[in-house]
Amino acid sequence: MPGKAHSHALRSGRFSAPGQIYMVTTRLSSGGRTFANWRLGRLVVNELRLVHEQDIAHSLAWVVMPDHLHWLFELRLGTLDRVLQRVKSRSAIAINRATGDTGRVWQTGYQDIAVRHDESLKNFARYIVAKPLRAGLVRTVRDYPLWDCKWL
């Protein structure tokens, strides 16, 4: 598969630090639109809220799009890989239970940006929250049910 041969090189430079803020994007494995079913998207939301409540990662903004997740958060405990593994595996189990499927839900890996302290978190949050608008899914952000932002 193209791109797989050097995927370890992307991970080798990844740095996890408690207190660091990350913007992460992760996609569905099938390329499908599983989260167009908002009930299934809520299962991902439940996991984001759980890691927040357990002080593992403090969510600043997120949006569950039909085929991917954007998440801005502060890492509190563990590593970036472990937090993403937890959210993805627990949500995949819940989604497979809800649908009766047994297959893979998420792609392996994710894209991440370590946000510098001098960058505007609100600009990252605006970018995330406006994704459904830019994708033409809704006319106003209020019409899309699968997002949240600390500042709104």
Regions found by a protein language model. Name each.
Residues M1-L152:
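Short catalytic/metal-binding and nucleic-acid-binding patches
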